[in-house]
Amino acid sequence: MADRTAPRCQLRLEWVYGYRGHQCRNNLYYTAGKEVVYFVAGVGVVYNTREHSQKFFLGHNDDIISLALHPDKTLVATGQVGKEPYICIWDSYNVQTVSLLKDVHTHGVACLAFDSDGQRLASVGLDAKNTVCIWDWRKGKLLASATGHSDRIFDISWDPYQPNRVVSCGVKHIKFWTLCGNALTAKRGIFGKTGDLQTILCLACAKEDITYSGALNGDIYVWKGLNLVRTIQGAHSAGIFSMYACEEGFATGGRDGCIRLWDTDFKPITKIDLRETEQGYKGLSIRSVCWKADRLLAGTQDSEIFEVIVRERDKPMLILQGHCEGELWALALHPKKPLAVTGSDDRSVRLWSLADHALIARCNMEEAVRSVAFSPDGSQLALGMKDGSFIVLRVRDMTEVVHIKDRKEVIHEMKFSPDGSYLAVGSNDGPVDVYAVAQRYKKIGECSKSLSFITHIDWSLDSKYLQTNDGAGERLFYRMPSGKPLTSKEEIKGIPWASWTCVKGPEVSGIWPKYTEVTDINSVDANYNSSVLVSGDDFGLVKLFKFPCLKRGAKFRKYVGHSAHVTNVRWSHDFQWVLSTGGADHSVFQWRFIPEGVSNGMLETAPQEGGADSYSEESDSDLSDVPELDSDIEQEAQINYDRQVYKEDLPQLKQQSKEKNHAVPFLKREKAPEDSLKLQFIHGYRGYDCRNNLFYTQAGEVVYHIAAVAVVYNRQQHSQRLYLGHDDDILSLTIHPVKDYVATGQVGRDAAIHVWDTQTLKCLSLLKGQHQRGVCALDFSADGKCLVSVGLDDFHSIVFWDWKKGEKIATTRGHKDKIFVVKCNPHHVDKLVTVGIKHIKFWQQAGGGFTSKRGTFGSVGKLETMMCVSYGRMEDLVFSGAATGDIFIWKDILLLKTVKAHDGPVFAMYALDKGFVTGGKDGIVELWDDMFERCLKTYAIKRSALSTSSKGLLLEDNPSIRAITLGHGHILVGTKNGEILEIDKSGPMTLLVQGHMEGEVWGLAAHPLLPICATVSDDKTLRIWELSAQHRMLAVRKLKKGGRCCAFSPDGKALAVGLNDGSFLVVNADTVEDMVSFHHRKEMISDIKFSKDTGKYLAVASHDNFVDIYNVLTSKRVGICKGASSYITHIDWDSRGKLLQVNSGAREQLFFEAPRGKRHIIRPSEIEKIEWDTWTCVLGPTCEGIWPAHSDITDVNAASLTKDCSLLATGDDFGFVKLFSYPVKGQHARFKKYVGHSAHVTNVRWLHNDSVLLTVGGADTALMIWTREFVGTQESKLVDSEESDTDVEEDGGYDSDVAREKAIDYTTKIYAVSIREMEGTKPHQQLKEVSVEERPPVSRAAPQPEKLQKNNITKKKKLVEELALDHVFGYRGFDCRNNLHYLNDGADIIFHTAAAGIVQNLSTGSQSFYLEHTDDILCLTVNQHPKYRNVVATSQIGTTPSIHIWDAMTKHTLSMLRCFHSKGVNYINFSATGKLLVSVGVDPEHTITVWRWQEGAKVASRGGHLERIFVVEFRPDSDTQFVSVGVKHMKFWTLAGSALLYKKGVIGSLGAAKMQTMLSVAFGANNLTFTGAINGDVYVWKDHFLIRLVAKAHTGPVFTMYTTLRDGLIVTGGKERPTKEGGAVKLWDQEMKRCRAFQLETGQLVECVRSVCRGKGKILVGTKDGEIIEVGEKNAASNILIDGHMEGEIWGLATHPSKDLFISASNDGTARIWDLADKKLLNKVSLGHAARCAAYSPDGEMVAIGMKNGEFVILLVNSLKVWGKKRDRKSAIQDIRISPDNRFLAVGSSEHTVDFYDLTQGTNLNRIGYCKDIPSFVIQMDFSADGKYIQVSTGAYKRQVHEVPLGKQVTEAVVIEKITWASWTSVLGDEVIGIWPRNADKADVNCACVTHAGLNIVTGDDFGLVKLFDFPCTEKFAKHKRYFGHSAHVTNIRFSYDDKYVVSTGGDDCSVFVWRCL
């Protein structure tokens, strides 16, 4: 019995005792079929109460902790814990998986909820962020996710009446979520004063925004919107765990054991207290309730389920019970009856009836029970306790017989002897005690040899011996009852054991895996009858093994269900059942045993479906004698597809080497050559490790692949068209069922799949991001909409794609060994089959995952490695080809029969209408009928069968066949040897294409006179190829060893070949027969060359570091060149045949003279003068420039120079073929590079006439033929080589504005940092001294004077309740573009400033606002499609900025896109249909992302450029083509599926043009693109080639261009000095040939336009300086609509004391006076310096302005003439004030001073006093009402009071308390302590202002918020209202004179906001 096979018998889960009531809630429901659904451990249970039956869902692999019922009451969603937890949606009727949601949550899924129509599912994770996710669950697609909360979330629910509203609750919070686009945004519920902030445990949503929630204290909290509106107190007396909403109303259940029913308005109906009922008990706690019509379900903490019928509510029925919380270890089965007993840490012992599936008795103990044992007659029951004691009970009435405590540690194992006389008790102390049953359990023996705790014990049949296992893994034997150790091996061997529950011992060594020391098997039990053993382990698996199982690593069957530790397993007395107990899940599973041969087939397909199937994956072999793997298959399974370095590493390598060598001054790089190459033909086909990779297109062309190229071969013309989109070896290829589309998959770190069109060779979709290493198998679905792929990662992941969209639909792990083929079921789109090494699996897609079943072999066959598979014509038939040569025929997943087809593996199979064709390793093609009953015809592939039209020769007869296909009356065959043949049905075969076999190709030589070349490879063949139009192999010869080099003699008659063993031979070039051979070296021969003319000498270079020189005529070695310190890589002769140039692996360039090999040292200048016969060397000054910057890693393997010494071609280790102009002096020359080879280009050679370049590709086995395209012929068709990169060093032009914009760093903005450098303790953190004011309330003293002088304009004091944004002065032009548009045919305009999107009506001038952004808006675009009228998109700065799409008229948000562009989004644009949106970020990669904005789905994303991208715009007629421009950047993009492909703009040979920094883009018909450059030129592109320049369209940079869709006219805007004929705005015709200029009349020296838009007869212009101007097209008149401040912070602000005017003063050097009523600019004055503060005099006549340079000026308000100015300080004036009597001027500066001036003394402004002792810079000042005092706030968070005008500080609190102030703008002081927020660590409150009525204060802070408080504001963290609009810093704020308006100014946003007071 020493085989290791799995047993043929099986288990099936029949019953589970238990319900998970702990740590879960809301997990119990009625289904539509009136069954009860719940979960326990890892099993979903559907329990039918009427029939008392259970169904199980086994799709999880760990504990289930959450459950939701679909509105249809049939589907169920369950979520689990685990490292990669997933959600299963399954059908409660047939317990099959419907969908899997995975790859998002970690740790676990805590809550689930379906929305009201059941389409979407919300889930909450157990991760630290408690992530909330919304799924389209049928598709398995994540719609949105967001951080849920910092603490646990307990419940989540959809609002049934508002489709996008979700509510979640948990620890101390409730949140109301809105789903918009892909953004989930939450608002916290406001508890307010209505109820205490506390933990909310459950919730239900009702109509009209009402939410009911259950709180921890037993109250019901009722919410309306976000606010708590009322509480229902004492609904329960403790926490409410569960709330269930249904038609009838609501049911709640709590920790108090009560169920309460409420009507739909939450009025109480009734209360049921389960504690008071018959089965109730103290401490009963309800975790889950469900109400359906007249029935209620309640699940309790202690794992019971009650059913209550409402009419008989005092008689609840206990329909299910299990063990409570606490580990469950004890299990014993009755020796005579179908009874089981369990004991648990919940201190109960329970007796279960296995026949009735019911609990029949329960007995509570004082202590936790850890082991139980029945006496052999079943009358007594022994219990082992956790405290070291044991108790014996009488079974019939459960009364105690004895209670003995001899040990301290837990008793884990006990057994009665088979004769019933002894009880052995094993404890964790180590010994086993033996007690005599008849003597009232007197202790009579002790087994004490064990050093560790006892884990298992077994008695011998005769009760004379005992064996033990312990924690140290020892197995010991004792004589009974004395307990003496037994050591004699012989004696032990013969003992028959009564039971076998030990895990150690020879009989069970097979249960342990090989080579590991683990202790994770907790329990086993042997069934001697059926020779099987059951085991339970720490991974939650119950396994069946054969018994005995002697060899380690035996195969088994495994069963899932328990989640974590299975603590015990036992057979029932009659072996009908196995019982298993779960430790942590404290459940008992009852499994039915199905012996071998019973209803085998029926059972195999039982609906035991789940993620893991019940026949294990680790143990998938039913055989111990696994057949030998076929050598080909074994070799293939061992191929490693990892690369040392991938092409995508190149930019980084370049960057690193730049950083390393940054000191090198940059010399002028050599120019790239004019000539170019075109790939014309490739010899080769990849057959050695690929299959099914050869197809006919409908046009009859043949498509296959080699290296990184997919080939479309025309049989008639023997020509090839090539798809060159891949950048590494292609490994798989498949063709679309309907169209001529092909999918190809490649090698790669992130391996890509391309779907492309064979007609146009254009990529339709590029699929990435799912596979590692490579893609080894592909197949289209029958309808062609989906594609399935298999990767080469360790799990061979399977991915199902919607290829057009480029989205993955579903993924799963495939198999641990290689999968060879995947096939889609032609009848069912969602089914697949895979075959591979010892593997066949049938897959069913379920949402985002797959469920699988393994093929069931039964007795028909045994598990084999399968090489190919096909579906039959009948629906459920599958045919697979095995490594043995058999065809296996399957029906569904059952094997029907096998048919012998080939000798050796069946590698290929193709299904026809009426049959199949197969191909095998035996080189035979067989045609079969449709059931593989008859073989209709065979074709052996032999040389003799080849037709004359063949394009080559067969290397050998019967080559192994790897691919086969039928079509066009032929069979197409691909062989392992790299041949493609076409077999005519009548027999003759034509060889179409061939190449080398597996192995690297290095040797390449071109014939000196004819178009012929030779190659030699590690595949041990030498081949001669014809390169004329025939393209075929002329001759081939097998060699004894592989070879790495070859060379023709000068006359072409002889061919020398160097081999890898150090020998070389010379063969006749025509017959390839030997002429001579030598073996002088041990290491490989690396290069070989004949000298020129007569070919007198042959030089042979080897890896032995020598070059040997032979005389050809005498066949003697005449010289040896010594002196190289490393292996030789290249050699070349000079044209006289005298001098040899040698390169070595140590990068030495050496020279030797023939014949003796004497070494010469030659100076570099001389080397160039020598005429060389050939140049294949890679070192020396003339080819220094061929080495890339990162060449420490990659090597240039080969070079070849044309005869005229003008072009040098090289091949390198990145698969690039490059062309350089020779000589290549200086570093890093420019080149043209070409792709096609995959990893290494090993050799390159020009043909004798230099018209063709030949290259060979190392491991890709390909020989590629490139034709040289000369300069002259190119013009007609521009050749698109990958140009060498446009270098950063190259100057892209300069302009100050562009440079500034490039340098803007948005990160400093994101994190709200204080805008002033304050130091000290924040006010709300300072310790407060007790003020005088806090006197006793009753006092005879006179009343305190007012804090603030009240201006009694109106008699009644007005409280400001609310602010509303009324108008904004500002437009962001300084770093944005194209952000100003017409709406509604020119009636409105839309633009942005700060964080506000603004729509302004041109006729009324009124504005409306979009205020949902949280920081500066950076870009704005309007959807041009009529279907999406007035749809606007805007985006902003931020760490995870969002794009908002909104309706410009209603301001309603249509979608929100959360982006990955860190820092901010700086340009967005809609596609032609308006459905897509493209965005580009200011992140370091300048990522470009395309979105489907309505769904919120990201379509594609890719790094755009290393420097700033300014504009990215879709072509106006396309949804897939767009253009991006930026700093030296011009790319033309195509959206292919979910990938972005680009072509760089090719400048070509247009004389003056070079790649500039491009700033703007416009479009014309016929694929014309116009781009505006930094130097004022406009570049005109056709496709991606530059065709002309519009020179100097503007004199400075062309910042903006606008394409008018209706007539194609183009508007440009630039930076230009206004002249007569020029202008900063121009209107052009469609081709930009003629234009008309417009002046803007702004009066500035240089006009700089940032945005243009054309409406009906008008052009809308936005300038850098914040002006918005409308220009008439006819009359060229310009009208200024908005004239905001220019760039620079605005700090100065003052409102007029008696009129609706205010003044703002900014760092832009201007002061502006605005009219509040008419919302317009009245006047502006240029001050010449940045201004920091402003103040009106109380009489309104004068205004004082303080400057940043320490100067201040006083202007007369009416004329704005200067009345006086003075500069007594050198640093900034921070605040300036005029006293209430117009007499004193106070000037506060950064120099810690306040200066006083007397205005009555006239304009010379002499200082009359100043304040000192000010601790820091001044920030605000206020005069007292009588003008005698001034209060000064400082940068140290200190407020001081000084006398005026002497400046003495007042310190007596009594005096200060009595002062009445004329105004209050201070942010410091007890009166305003409440304005400081909690989160002000890095950010300050910058400004404040109290109303003239003295009742309110408004503040502005570093978060960009304007806040409204009551005044005085003396309680910390006072309540307030907050208003958004400004971006980061609000710098100043004032009420207007009559408190009707608030004016606020922004720091960075340069905007002035006017708010109406309500």
Swiss-Prot record:
Compartments it resides in: Cytoplasm, Cytoskeleton
InterPro entries: Beta-prop_EML-like_2nd (IPR055442), Beta-prop_EML_1st (IPR055439), Haem_d1_sf (IPR011048), HELP (IPR005108), Quinoprotein_ADH-like_sf (IPR011047), WD40/YVTN_repeat-like_dom_sf (IPR015943), WD40_repeat_dom_sf (IPR036322), WD40_rpt (IPR001680)
A GO term for molecular function: microtubule binding
Keyword flag Disulfide bond: no
Placement of WD repeats on the sequence: 59-100, 104-145, 148-187, 195-233, 235-273, 280-321, 323-362, 364-403, 406-445, 561-601, 725-766, 770-811, 814-853, 861-900, 901-940, 996-1035, 1038-1077, 1080-1120, 1191-1230, 1236-1276, 1412-1456, 1460-1501, 1504-1543, 1553-1591, 1593-1638, 1685-1724, 1726-1767, 1768-1807, 1880-1919, 1925-1958
Region annotated Disordered, chain positions: 603-626, 1322-1353
Biased composition (Basic and acidic residues): 1322-1337
Taxonomy, superkingdom: Eukaryota
A GO CC term attached to the entry: cytoplasm
Keywords annotated in UniProt: Cytoplasm, Cytoskeleton, Microtubule, Repeat, WD repeat
Bias (Acidic residues) ranges: 615-626
Principal location: cytoplasm
Family of the protein in this entry: Belongs to the WD repeat EMAP family.
Protein name (record): Echinoderm microtubule-associated protein-like 6
Provenance organism: Homo sapiens
